[in-house]
């Protein structure tokens, strides 16, 4: 197998497994916390708020993209010729090709940083960025096979993840915000569960006690129930 063939196989494998990657990094962060030195763990309300803000920014990007995609799909079901292009090029997609991947990176960067373990924060952030890049590359290869030269021309004109605000964008024809919230509910509650779990572990390591405050227990139970219901009620793609 040539290096190009191995790279192609790797990126397509990472793309297929992309939804499992956050669980791997959260599990690795849990292990890093359990084997860390308590006084070396970054903690505090300001640090936690910054990590939450990172994840919230990622959700904002994802929800914008999902709202536009949901509207596009509903229009195309009613009228297959409603759009000239077979793939999204309007709204947020006119400035960045992969807003879902970019948003997803920010969403899960929050829990990675929230571990507060210095070496893990750096290494896991870089490793997750590499995984997201491979997933985007794998998706791009599949779309090039499907759409051909029109998609390649769009790739040449549109950045992958860092928006070009100097480039004139195309307004989104519409958005279905409620549909976007339903589509991303499982990701939202999964990220919330990761924050609660890592927060409980940090309390154990910093305070050297398993007597976790009741508020963490209540929050954890509520998040787990919400996650279960979001999985059961998840709309089919």
Label each residue range with its predicted role.
Residues 1-93, 105-237:
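Membrane-anchoring alpha-helices and their flanking helix-loop junctions
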Residues 96-99:
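Histidine-centered phosphotransfer motif of kinases
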């Amino acid at each position: 197998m040539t290096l190009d063939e191995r790279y192609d196989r790797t990126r397509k494998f990472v793309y297929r497994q992309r939804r499992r990657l956050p669980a791997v990094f959260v599990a690795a962060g849990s292990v890093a916390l359990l084997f860390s030195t308590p006084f070396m763990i970054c903690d505090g309300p300001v640090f936690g708020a910054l990590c939450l803000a990172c994840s919230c920014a990622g959700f904002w990007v994802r929800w914008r993209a999902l709202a536009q995609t949901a509207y596009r799909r509903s229009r195309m079901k009613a009228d297959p010729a409603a759009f000239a292009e077979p793939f999204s090029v309007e709204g947020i997609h006119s400035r960045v090709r992969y807003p879902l991947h970019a948003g997803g990176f920010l969403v899960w960067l929050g829990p990675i940083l929230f571990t507060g373990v210095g070496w893990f924060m750096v290494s896991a952030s870089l490793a997750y960025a590499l995984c997201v890049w491979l997933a985007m590359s794998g998706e791009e290869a599949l779309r090039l096979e499907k759409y051909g030269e029109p998609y390649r021309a769009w790739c040449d004109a549109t950045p992958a993840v860092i928006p070009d605000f100097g480039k004139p964008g195309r307004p989104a024809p519409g958005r279905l915000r409620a549909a976007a919230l339903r589509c991303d509910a499982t990701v939202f509650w999964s990220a919330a569960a990761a924050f609660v779990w890592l927060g409980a572990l940090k309390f154990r390591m910093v305070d050297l006690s398993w007597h976790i405050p009741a508020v963490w227990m209540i929050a954890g139970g509520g998040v787990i129930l919400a996650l279960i219901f979001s999985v059961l009620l998840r709309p089919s793609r």
